[in-house]
Amino acid sequence: MEIRRRPPNPSIKVANLEYAIPHPDSKPKNILEEIVWEKHLEVEIARKKVSLEDLKKKIKDLPKTKNFIDALRNSNSKPALISEIKKASPSRGIIREDFDAKMIGKMYQEGGANCISVLTDKKFFQGGFDVLVEVRKEIIIPILCKDFILYPYQLYQARAAGADAALLIAAILTDSDLKYLSKVAEHLGLTILVEVHDSEELERVLNINVFNLIGINNRNLKSFKTDLEVTKKLAENYANQIKENSITLVSESGLFNREDLDLVKSYGADAVLVGESLMSQEDILGGVKKLIGNL
């Protein structure tokens, strides 16, 4: 599925009036494209508020990042667990009204999560880099910045906020984008989790051959429905390449209980990323323990 970048909408000046003519391609075709277009504007605004140089200065004073992949590979429970802090989503709306990111992060860590994912998108997920900063103050396990990253500036934002890893989504990035952003991330000490949704995207990522952490998202980008068979199909069809390249495989979306985790583990997943099902529970601590089999 092609995700276009926001097209220019040129202004026309007549006498003292300036106006823009609506272009037939001036509206996003789907929710992911809408998010990408909004992200472009969000980053433009952020750059005006905080310069890249300011972010670099802040990063200089930060401690070294934690090893995200090692935290997953060294997990006592299998598959390893990445618990996600997410207040809302386009498909569900508000997931948790009593949202206390710091408390949720502490419960995830106490419950036995190996890593934590923090949504930093504002408009569609009601997150933010300020949320990541607050969570970082409370926990010691590695943190993934989960956002719709299009530009190097966003990786600097993630690192400055205290992230140890960042998400890149193959569906919204070209091969050149993926290669360049991976180099920027490496420079910053950030681990990249690159996310794919189908065999075409997975082949692209494998051919680039620089990623050791790949996430298979079980959610269909058009219908937003989830199907764990996506992990099964991709993990099994590309098992040899995944093994040869020592890739840590993460199954994402549509995971609700221990049975789901055991299922994707049997398909070849080394880790899982679980968000909505945990965020929806009254007892988050107990929910984490149940997922990893400690309750």
Swiss-Prot record:
Enzyme class of the recorded protein, top EC level: lyase
Signal peptide: none
Database matches in CDD domains: IGPS (cd00331)
Pfam families assigned to the protein according to its UniProt record, in alphabetical order: IGPS
Reactions performed catalytically: 1-(2-carboxyphenylamino)-1-deoxy-D-ribulose 5-phosphate + H(+) = (1S,2R)-1-C-(indol-3-yl)glycerol 3-phosphate + CO2 + H2O
GO biological process: L-tryptophan biosynthetic process
EC number annotated for this UniProt entry: 4.1.1.48
Family: Belongs to the TrpC family.
Name by which UniProt lists this protein: Indole-3-glycerol phosphate synthase
Organism placement in taxonomy: Bacteria, Bacillati, Cyanobacteriota, Cyanophyceae, Synechococcales
Gene this protein is translated from: trpC
